[in-house]
Amino acid sequence: MNKIYYILFLSAQCLVHMGKCERNQKTTRLTRSANNASLEKGPIIERSIRMSNPWKAFMEKYDLERAHNSGIRIDLGEDAEVGNSKYRIPAGKCPVFGKGIVIENSNVSFLTPVATGAQRLKEGGFAFPNADDHISPITIANLKERYKENADLMKLNDIALCKTHAASFVIAEDQNTSYRHPAVYDEKNKTCYMLYLSAQENMGPRYCSPDSQNKDAMFCFKPDKNENFDNLVYLSKNVSNDWENKCPRKNLGNAKFGLWVDGNCEEIPYVNEVEARSLRECNRIVFEASASDQPRQYEEELTDYEKIQEGFRQNNRDMIKSAFLPVGAFNSDNFKSKGRGYNWANFDSVNNKCYIFNTKPTCLINDKNFFATTALSHPQEVDNEFPCSIYKDEIEREIKKQSRNMNLYSVDKERIVLPRIFISTDKESIKCPCEPEHISNSTCNFYVCNCVEKRAEIKENNEVIIKEEFKEDYENPDGKHKKKMLLIIIGVTGAVCVVAVASLFYFRKKAQDDKYDKMDQAEAYGKTANTRKDEMLDPEASFWGEDKRASHTTPVLMEKPYY
């Protein structure tokens, strides 16, 4: 059996060494650095071709299609049924800072309760009507008092608590409905408002009347980010409790959004340029152009204002629905943006330009003259701290990671593998073949290496693609090696198993043969071998002789019984 173990041990060693060879033979994953090719005595410095992005984690909250996943300017991204009626309700996962609803030609705030009873239609707003149980508006202090026995709710921040409060109420006529009311939180007054109406826009002479004198006509309204709404935060039922980690709030100072292109953050080439006098104005512009779920097809006529007014007075949702969510919204034009739109902008504070675009940014460019903003962001709040060490830290992490891999898998351990990062505050760390260029308008004292050939480029629609001549390195680069290695391992493993099984049978049979051979041999019981052999073969020998002897029929020792 020791031979079997020896064979298995040698086979395992063979597989281990084959794995090491396979890793060391991946020459396509590394490129020799030009300025270090002549270093024979020192460590070999090579450049990885893996295009990792050091901004990946930082930029996750700015991927608004994933983080918010619904309209921003108009958020009607979810359907809900109440009884036999279908409604569209807000569904965004992030707060929208500075968003409010403007009622045209009216001094009534949208945070005013809707008109009920004898009130005329335009005397009311969008907020929840007064009720016996005072649930809206309600201050954060009163909310905390209301839910003081609920430990989980007491852990929430003010915005999450307001959202949770509004979403906790279910319509009495349908307890199983997923319909929930949106909310608005006033950060200045620390007050939470539940909204009775989910609609955010109703415009055009066919659907509303801007005439302020016609108090019974349906009012026109639209979303906006004006100065009056700076302290407001628009909330859907789906806003994450940990939105601070998943959603943007502050604008980014000394920065502009860019695209990560093989080792450096580059300008977004295809943008829409708009005049803007301030960051606030640029933020308002990008909000107006942002993702919208507003339906574009309505029914032919909407003239029964008396019916609409009666709907408010009687709290009849079917009548209200016909005004705010017309029939066409649920037919061919039930549009859901899923967060896709012109959601990002770079504001040039020197030239007063606002550059808006609909491509998800993947990095930040350090520029003291710019601000990066989103349609979700606060109109004024700014974070001026640029993460200057992000490149240097990532280079150090990647080198340590590659060093560990070299120690595990490389025969030649005298190698340093550099990541494809060609910008840093430490110009020595990027190992540039030429003199790195100093970025003059950077607040972080960055150096960039521009003489290394890029393996990727920006094409139309701001799409980053790998250049044609390098595609072979990135089209499942490990797939062929892994497939080949897998076949080799399967073959070797199969051969080892066959050899092991054959060896097992061979040694087991040999062991049995040896055992029976020993049984056939004479054993020393005080007599010579020849004497015992003669006794065993002599049929006249006494079976119960006085001396002990082996049986000639069985391999056991028999003795004379005593009675």
From Swiss-Prot:
Print the organism lineage: Eukaryota, Sar, Alveolata, Apicomplexa, Aconoidasida
UniProt entry tagged with the keyword Glycoprotein: yes
- Give the record's family classification: Belongs to the apicomplexan parasites AMA1 family.
According to the record, glycans are attached at N36, N107, N176, N189, N238, N441
Superkingdom in the source lineage: Eukaryota
Q: What does this protein do?
A: Merozoite receptor PK66 is a surface antigen involved in parasite invasion of erythrocytes.
Q: What else is known?
A: PK66 expressed in mature schizonts is rapidly processed as the schizont ruptures, yielding a 42/44 kDa doublet associated with the surface merozoite.
Q: Name one GO cellular component term.
A: membrane
Signal peptide from the UniProt entry = 1-13
Question: Pfam families annotated for this entry?
Answer: AMA-1
Entry's localization field: Membrane
Q: Which cysteines are joined by disulfide bonds?
A: none
Q: What is this protein called?
A: Merozoite receptor PK66
**Chain ranges on the Cytoplasmic side, renumbered to this chain:** 509-563
What topology does it adopt in the membrane? Single-pass type I membrane protein
- Transmembrane segments annotated in the record for this chain: 488-508
Sorted UniProt keywords: Glycoprotein, Malaria, Membrane, Signal, Transmembrane, Transmembrane helix
Q: Which residues lie on this side of the membrane: Extracellular?
A: 14-487
Query: Has UniProt tagged this entry with the keyword Signal?
Result: yes
